[in-house]
Amino acid sequence: MTASPSKLAQLRELSVVVADTGDYDAIKRLQPVDCTTNPTLVKKALDLPVYADLLERELTWGRAHGGDDRTTTVDEVADRLTIGVGVKLSALVPGRVSTEVDADLAHDTQATIAKARKFVAMYAERGVPKDKILIKIAATWEGIEAARQLQLEGIDCNLTLIFNRAQALACAEANVFLISPFVGRILDYYVAQGQTPASIDEDPGVVFVRTVYNAFKQRGSSTVVMGASFRSTAQIEALAGCDRLTISPDLLEKLDAEHGELPRKLSPGNANNAQITPIDSDSFASGLAADPMATEKLASGIDTFAKDLHALRKTIADKLAG
């Protein structure tokens, strides 16, 4: 008797599977279409033997170009390592690698645009075209406005830390390539408030992604919805059929080990109950202000990303000084 396909194999027939990791070996093993990086993943990746040559090469560059401005050198080495990891990963996946713009630029439109252009140029210098990468930007109003301009320049963006309908719709209005609503962090907030859902269909993170997906499909929006930040395989299964799902290696492994039918939960033809209203800066701000969960999670997410970036820079500074 032929074994039934794993749930991961079935999921791949319904959604584009993205690996939420920079772990070279895990990506080789699990074969996602896309992968994503951030400063924490880059920092972890630098401990892996496969990146040893990259690390040594960029530290050597940093020591040779140190000069008097140590902070600028450290920041530049961090950028070079981030792009170096992305270049290596781009050779493993047939699709895209998401690369994160500095979180401490989240409220600065022009600085975000400048850093995104710099990253695209750095990738190009290393032989990776811009259609192989996504520039990951926090979904503040300023970040969305930066993405609007970058999209006009042909630089595709992944707007992350999406917790609220106003954020999602503003991204669609800006013709952003892709958004990443954070399923697990939404659930975390409500569980911490003592509001544990009775079923997966009442999970607030799952409900939010379904609502956004339906709104985009009903609107005819080309913006890709990529569910992110999963806490369980049940959340992933509840969103089977979503455009893309970015999943950590441990949950990918669990899905690969599980069998049984995985039904489609989302499809463009079944999109319903989604009303579209235009979003400007005022309605964006009021939409966030009326949503304590989104306000808290967006701010804490940016803070966490910024701390992760500073931790990466500190690691580099220590290695340069060693």
Curated annotation (Swiss-Prot):
Main location per UniProt?
cytoplasm
Per its record, the protein catalyses: D-sedoheptulose 7-phosphate + D-glyceraldehyde 3-phosphate = D-erythrose 4-phosphate + beta-D-fructose 6-phosphate
Q: Name one GO cellular component term.
A: cytosol
Among InterPro entries, the record links this protein to: Aldolase_TIM, TAL/FSA, Transaldolase_1, Transaldolase_AS
Q: Which domain of life is it from?
A: Bacteria
In its keyword annotation, does this UniProt entry include Transferase?
yes
Single biological process term from Gene Ontology: carbohydrate metabolic process
What pathway is this protein a component of?
Carbohydrate degradation; pentose phosphate pathway; D-glyceraldehyde 3-phosphate and beta-D-fructose 6-phosphate from D-ribose 5-phosphate and D-xylulose 5-phosphate (non-oxidative stage): step 2/3
**Catalytic machinery residues:** 136
MF terms from GO for this chain are:
transaldolase activity
Entry keyword Cytoplasm: yes
- Keywords in alphabetical order: Cytoplasm, Pentose shunt, Schiff base, Transferase
What EC number(s) is this enzyme filed under?
2.2.1.2
Q: Where in the cell is it found?
A: Cytoplasm
- Write down the PROSITE patterns for this protein, in alphabetical order: TRANSALDOLASE_1, TRANSALDOLASE_2
**Matching CDD domains:** Transaldolase_TalAB (cd00957)
**Which Pfam family is one of this chain's hits?**
TAL_FSA
Q: What class of enzyme is it?
A: transferase
Complex formation:
Homodimer.
Family of this protein: Belongs to the transaldolase family. Type 1 subfamily.
Q: How is this protein named in the record?
A: Transaldolase
Task: Report which gene this protein is encoded by.
Answer: tal
